[in-house]
């Protein structure tokens, strides 16, 4: 009873105490203008959205970027006062071929980051072009003078790079350090004050014998890479756990590693956390009411410790349910909204924190 009272008290005052961008969501599948309008009404602070290198940079021709789809997201988000956190991810087929990976498009090559100097330079150039377009004073804002100018100031580099599901042929700390350094160089060449955020680290990566690395081990090894601390400003965590105790312990452990390396100024970004409303056997399936209860207690914990742990964002996975293209056993029902956008009890709990409708 005491825990529930604390959670309710935290949610009642959250919108007055936290920065507007603190509470976020992660879309899975297509993101429409109606989705973003709903986010705006609900006072969603941040949408973490994939910035797909593989789709935007289709050929080796210089600066032949296809920005239209991402332009539409950024434009509607600006209208609705929703911040965008781009998660730069995936590899174009022409870069994969240059790297010697020739699997079909969308296969393992798409999640096999470049390792050669030429591939890393293409990656650096892509990130620089993205910041030049969407950052402060960017081309996008010049081309759209009637939009509220909301430049993107933080950029996330890859997703769950400690998991073979997202990093082929297997997770490698030194390879990721090179990827991160190239991205950071491109971003800061265009916006020296931009924040560079690590890809979200998952506690126990799956992948059979594929060589996943525990999230805490990956972060420790990353800090051991010479000069790498200058390349990033934020550490992202995906603290999935059936129990809230497990979620809390993951965040505390990651924070302790950051503090041990003298990087207390680096923020902790929860770029994915969530439970599902499904009823299957997976431990993250909690049913509709259980999902809402987990959100309420988790968000209350993050809100109460925001300043002490320097938590910059807590983003719920996912925004809306999906059908047929979920990336995990429980993900299809992880949304705050059903597939047809019907709100779940978890969405109502989310609104208690944001003060939205």
Feature-to-residue mapping (PLM):
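Noncatalytic carbohydrate-binding groove/subsite architecture in carbohydrate-active enzymes
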Residues: 22, 33, 37, 124-153, ...
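Secretory targeting and sorting signals
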Residues: 1-16
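Aromatic-rich peripheral "rim/lid" segments of glycoside hydrolase catalytic domains that contact
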Residues: 102-105, 151, 156, 161, ...
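Extracytoplasmic/secreted cell-surface and envelope-processing proteins
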Residues: 34-35, 56-60, 94-98, 164-167, ...
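Extracellular cell-wall/glycan-interacting regions and their flexible linkers
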Residues: 14-17, 355-357
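Substrate-binding cleft and catalytic face of glycoside hydrolase catalytic domains
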Residues: 42-211, 227
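Boundary/entry segment of secreted carbohydrate-active catalytic domains
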Residues: 16-52
């Amino acid at each position: 009873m005491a825990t529930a009272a604390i959670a309710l008290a935290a949610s009642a005052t959250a919108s007055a105490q936290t920065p507007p961008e603190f509470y976020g969501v992660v879309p899975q599948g297509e993101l429409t203008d109606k989705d973003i309008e709903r986010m705006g009404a609900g006072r969603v602070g941040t949408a973490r959205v994939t910035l797909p290198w593989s789709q935007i940079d289709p050929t080796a021709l210089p600066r032949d970027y296809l920005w239209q789809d991402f332009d539409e997201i950024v434009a509607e988000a600006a209208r609705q006062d929703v911040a965008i956190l781009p998660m730069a991810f995936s590899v174009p087929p022409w870069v994969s071929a240059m790297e010697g990976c020739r699997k079909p498009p969308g296969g393992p090559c798409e999640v096999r980051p470049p390792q050669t100097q030429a591939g890393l330079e293409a990656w650096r150039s892509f990130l620089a072009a993205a910041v030049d377009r969407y950052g402060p004073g960017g081309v996008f804002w010049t081309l759209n003078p009637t939009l509220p100018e909301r430049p993107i100031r933080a950029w996330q580099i890859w997703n769950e790079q400690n998991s073979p599901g997202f990093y082929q042929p297997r997770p490698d700390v030194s390879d990721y350090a090179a990827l991160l350094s190239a991205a950071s160089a491109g971003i800061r060449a265009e916006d020296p004050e931009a924040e560079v955020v690590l890809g979200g680290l998952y506690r126990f990566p799956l992948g059979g014998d594929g060589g996943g690395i525990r999230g805490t081990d990956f972060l420790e090894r990353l800090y051991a890479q010479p000069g790498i601390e200058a390349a990033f400003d934020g550490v992202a965590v995906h603290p999935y756990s059936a129990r809230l105790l497990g979620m809390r312990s993951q965040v505390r452990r990651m924070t302790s590693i950051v503090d041990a390396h003298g990087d207390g100024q680096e923020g902790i970004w929860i770029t994915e956390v969530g439970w599902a409303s499904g009823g299957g056997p997976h431990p993250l399936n909690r049913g509709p009411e259980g999902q809402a209860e987990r959100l309420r207690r988790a968000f209350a914990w993050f809100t109460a410790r925001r300043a002490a742990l320097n938590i910059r964002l807590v983003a719920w996975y996912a925004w809306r349910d999906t059908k047929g293209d979920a990336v995990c056993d429980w993900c299809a029902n992880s949304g705050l909204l059903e597939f047809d956008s019907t709100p779940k009890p978890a969405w109502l709990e989310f609104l208690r924190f944001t003060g939205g409708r």
